[in-house]
Amino acid sequence: MLMPKRTKYRKMMKGRNRGYANRGTEFTFGEFALKATEAGRINSRQIEAARIALTRFVKRQGKTWIRVFPDKPLTKKPLETRMGKGKGAVEEWVMNIKPGRIIYEMAGVSEEMAREALTLAMHKLPFKTKFVTRESQNEIY
């Protein structure tokens, strides 16, 4: 599972996830990508499940890049615990995703194969995404 090696603080405030992405919206490596069209949170299990789905479909051909990293701790108190007594223990690591953010990139496969593989990955994610190519990347979300 993806998680930071070390952090300055163990726990973090929830924060708000508003607006559009202004970083990670352009192609860096591949020819095809999966771009978020709505806001949400993605955890390390979802990132890994989607990566496995698209890697198995292309039978390890081409190259895949994961453009997101879960760097925010999400805490949870144990079940049937009374309120108070401090913040809960870290349960999982997540990343806030804003519309326009590129999640995965692919290269070295045909467009049809990349579209099908990224569609399989799309179903593993908790927010809406769309398939984009390097030529169509300038379209609005």
Swiss-Prot record:
TM ranges are: none
GO biological processes: translation
Q: Name one Pfam family in it.
A: Ribosomal_L16
Q: Does the keyword rRNA-binding apply?
A: yes
Q: What GO MF annotations does this protein's record show?
A: rRNA binding; structural constituent of ribosome; tRNA binding
Q: Which UniProt keywords apply?
A: Ribonucleoprotein, Ribosomal protein, RNA-binding, rRNA-binding, tRNA-binding
* GO terms for cellular component: cytosolic large ribosomal subunit
- InterPro entries in the cross-refs: Ribosomal_uL16, Ribosomal_uL16_bact-type, Ribosomal_uL16_CS, Ribosomal_uL16_dom, Ribosomal_uL16_sf
The record's SUPFAM superfamilies line, in alphabetical order, gives: Ribosomal protein L16p/L10e (SSF54686)
> Carries keyword Ribosomal protein?
yes
**Record-stated family:** Belongs to the universal ribosomal protein uL16 family.
Subunit organization? Part of the 50S ribosomal subunit.
HAMAP family (UniProt xref): Ribosomal_uL16
Functional description taken from the UniProt entry: Binds 23S rRNA and is also seen to make contacts with the A and possibly P site tRNAs.
Checking PANTHER family in the record gives: 50S/60S RIBOSOMAL PROTEIN L16, LARGE RIBOSOMAL SUBUNIT PROTEIN UL16M
The name this protein carries in UniProt is: Large ribosomal subunit protein uL16
